[in-house]
Design a protein with these regions (language model features):
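Active-site-adjacent "subsite" loops/lids of carbohydrate-active enzymes
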Residues: 31, 39, 43-59, 131, ...
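Aromatic-lined carbohydrate-binding/catalytic grooves of carbohydrate-active enzymes
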Residues: 71-109
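Aromatic- and acidic-residue-enriched segments that line the glycan-binding/catalytic groove
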Residues: 86-101, 137-168, 205-228, 274-284
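Active-site neighborhood of glycoside hydrolase catalytic domains
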Residues: 180-188, 194-203, 207-281, 286-308, ...
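Substrate-binding cleft of secreted/luminal carbohydrate-active enzymes
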Residues: 293-319, 335-414
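Beta-strand-rich modules
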Residues: 488-510
Length: 537
């Protein structure tokens, strides 16, 4: 009888043993989002300047990832649509000037697709790649002559431009009220999801523009022409954004259900003096709902987004917008979706307004607040470049204190109906320097899926220990792993060890655990002692 078949037959014994191991079957604490935004607009993070060769761009991106990986980060959110343009090879959107120096100008190497390279580079390091789009920003200035001829801001006839675009301040924006614009943006997202192996689509905080003194939105005629059922223009504006968010969500789920859709909004939804029921105890001058017309809570309630990553760019105790109060508020309004907190890495050691940011303890306080809230699944830092500069030794703080152990991205169980197939350890081989483990997958049953990657937990002694101890996670395999072999080179002669393997799917939901394997490290190798059948993780 092979190991997989025997595992299936003996699964019912797990019910009997489940109480014994109940504490070990809880959600692993090694699950935590640890991400960084990589901004391309204005060449904030990457590439360092326009016009670099493809090899130079690759080298710079690899360098960023290597530093982030050393800090045990597990995801990057890369801005691939900074201002109506593309940091990738698109049949719809012109090449970005931040890449080549001129909008519409392709890289010198015709085979080079920056996003394709970045995805592979991230996945090779076992980091998720989320494609970050600014949906509505059409230009970063008023110089339309410098735009690519294929840019609709140039190519459309003047009588249609007024439907597609509006000017606000010194920039042009896509008009959220236009059904044609909405379909255009959906097509952009659809193209990315179909052609690229991304883990998520990410929108930032820009919907309607941040308000400027003396500026008014010029959309009253559009509202008069097509108010739909609205009598209030502000409700109408919010609904314009709602329609895009809903349509993008549905488009993604139809194409690739595992691709996550999330947003990184401004950190305050509404102040309490604006909304006693849904407002936070803050005095923010700008808020999502009333100024940017982004009804984040509606998107969460309706399940249109899979996570929210509010930009809480203030310190713990900052009077107008206290970090701790805002984390608590967002934690009470997740509606079953994931919550990742956006941290202002750019303020670390660099604030003339709030002295808290000039203390190396501030980021420790913020992460402590996050981890004390059961509804917070992790953090995203804005942005990568400040982390690389290491202000106040933040890299060292992350590596040696806060992010000392590796983690997986928390599983989004609401995005899948089944767990991935359960792996089983099928071979143990020892040498003087290592214990080698091999595992395989049981017979595939209807509706089950192969793991996307694997984790190995190791416990000292001859029993399964605490899965909540992050030091027990000793190995995470590459994505799309087919090798199914691991060498543990940190064993000690004469010591007994217990190994367990689990698998994860594309939304990081973990499988049942394998049966534990008990091994004694000997002078010349390792000796497998016995198995406990039917243990469920």
């Amino acid at each position: 009888m092979n190991v997989c078949l025997r595992f299936r037959i003996l699964l019912f014994f797990a019910v009997f043993s489940s109480a014994l191991f109940a504490q070990n079957r809880q959600k692993s604490p090694v699950a935590e989002m640890r991400g960084a935004w990589i901004a391309t607009v204005g060449n904030i993070d990457w590439p360092s300047k326009p016009g670099l060769s493809p090899d130079q761009q690759k080298m710079e991106f690899d360098s960023i990832l290597d530093v982030l990986k050393a800090m045990n980060m597990n995801a990057v959110f890369v801005q691939i649509r900074p201002a109506g343009d593309a940091m990738y090879k698109s049949p719809i959107v012109p090449w970005s000037k931040y890449l080549t120096g001129k909008q519409g100008l392709a890289p010198a190497d015709s085979l080079y697709d920056p996003m394709e390279y970045m995805i592979k580079a991230a996945h090779t390091r076992r980091m998720e790649f989320h494609a970050w789009l600014n949906p509505y920003r059409a230009s970063f200035d008023l110089d339309t002559a410098s735009l690519a001829p294929t840019n609709p801001l140039r190519s459309l006839p003047n009588n249609r431009k007024s439907e597609w675009f509006y000017r606000y301040g010194n920039r042009y924006y896509f008009n959220p009220a236009s059904a044609l614009v909405r379909q255009y943006l959906i097509n952009v997202v659809k193209d990315i999801v179909i052609r690229y192996d991304i883990d998520g689509i990410h929108f930032d905080d820009y919907y309607y523009p941040y308000k400027e003194t003396g500026q008014n939105l010029d959309d009253y005629n559009a509202f008069a022409r097509d108010p739909r059922h609205f009598t209030n223009i502000e409700d109408w504006r919010r609904d314009n954004i709602n329609l895009l968010i809903q349509d993008v969500s549905q488009t993604i789920k139809k194409l690739k259900p595992y691709v996550r859709f999330g947003v990184g909004p401004f950190g305050v939804y509404r102040n309490k003096d604006q909304d006693q029921n849904n407002g936070s105890d803050t005095r923010a001058g700008i808020v999502c709902y009333d100024d940017l017309y982004a009804d984040i809570l509606l998107w969460l309630k309706n399940g249109w987004i899979d996570y929210v990553a509010p930009q809480i760019y203030w310190s713990v105790g900052f009077p107008p917008a206290d970090y701790e109060k805002l984390v608590d508020w967002w934690g009470k309004h997740t509606y079953g979706r994931h919550l990742y907190i956006g941290h202002a890495a750019y303020k670390i050691g660099n604030s003339t307004i709030d002295p808290n940011w000039n203390s190396p303890e501030e980021i420790k306080r913020q992460i402590a607040v996050d981890r004390a809230n059961p509804n917070v699944q992790g953090s995203i830092f804005f942005s990568a470049r400040p982390l690389l500069r290491n202000p106040l030794g933040v890299q060292d703080t992350l590596i040696n204190v806060l992010y000392k152990s590796q983690t997986v991205v928390p599983g989004l169980s609401f995005m899948t109906k089944v767990a991935p197939l359960t792996p089983q350890i099928c071979g143990v081989k020892g040498s003087k320097s290592a214990v080698k483990l091999a595992w395989n997958i049981c017979n595939i049953l209807s509706g089950e899926e192969m793991p996307y990657y694997y984790a190995i937990y190791r416990f000292e002694g001859e029993s399964v220990g605490d899965f909540k101890d992050p030091s027990r996670l000793i190995y995470l395999s590459p994505y799309h792993d087919e090798k199914l072999i691991f060498e543990d080179q940190t064993t000690i002669e004469g010591q007994y060890y217990t190994y367990v393997v689990t698998g994860f799917n594309r939304v990081n939901v973990e499988s049942y655990s394998s049966d534990p394997v008990f091994v004694k490290k000997t002078k010349n190798g390792a000796k497998k002692k016995r198995k406990f059948w039917g243990y469920l993780f």
